[in-house]
Swiss-Prot record:
It comes from the Viruses. The lineage of its organism: Viruses, Varidnaviria, Bamfordvirae, Nucleocytoviricota, Pokkesviricetes. InterPro entries: Poxvirus_J1. This is MF7 protein. It holds the Pfam family Pox_J1.
Length: 148
């Protein structure tokens, strides 16, 4: 298993293996590995958006969540809103081993990496990253959260 597949497998696994792995790495290596994961997730996002566009072309309609991110947030519960934007550092138990799934998740990762090599999909940076310096509403939410 190459390094990219290994990273994606432990990232998608439903435990804290990815955080354990990152905690054991030097900062430069950890940031490079995070960028590798972002690259794979951007590919999956591009694949989903392209598939969504095809379905909409034949009349199946999705709500335009990607056009205005505010539709994704439920502002009725401010505690969950604060948790969403005010991330706390992750506690990682160093004694437990990193688990690498060798079943269906590994098959999914293998298929994803092969498809990514074969199908070049590109996303605009604005689709994958919300810059709080350019988005006033997002910046205002963050400033309110950081005052508390």
């Amino acid at each position: 298993m190459d390094h990219g597949k290994y990273l994606l497998t432990i990232f998608l696994n439903d435990d804290d293996s990815f955080f354990k792995y990152l905690a054991a790495q030097e900062d430069d290596v950890a940031m490079s590995d995070v960028h590798t994961i972002v690259d794979y997730l951007n590919f999956l996002l591009a694949l989903l958006i392209k598939s969504k566009d095809k379905l909409e072309a034949v009349g199946y309609y999705y709500a335009p969540l990607s056009e205005e991110y505010k539709a994704v947030f439920d502002f009725t519960d401010t505690k969950s809103l604060k948790q969403l934007f005010n991330k706390q550092p992750v506690y990682v138990e160093s004694d437990s081993p990193i688990c690498v799934d060798k079943g269906y998740l590994a098959d999914f990762v293998l298929a994803t990496t092969r498809l990514k090599k074969q199908l070049p999909l590109v996303l605009d940076k604005e689709v994958t990253y919300v810059d709080p310096y350019k988005d006033k509403r997002f910046a205002n939410i963050l400033s309110i959260l950081h005052k508390n």
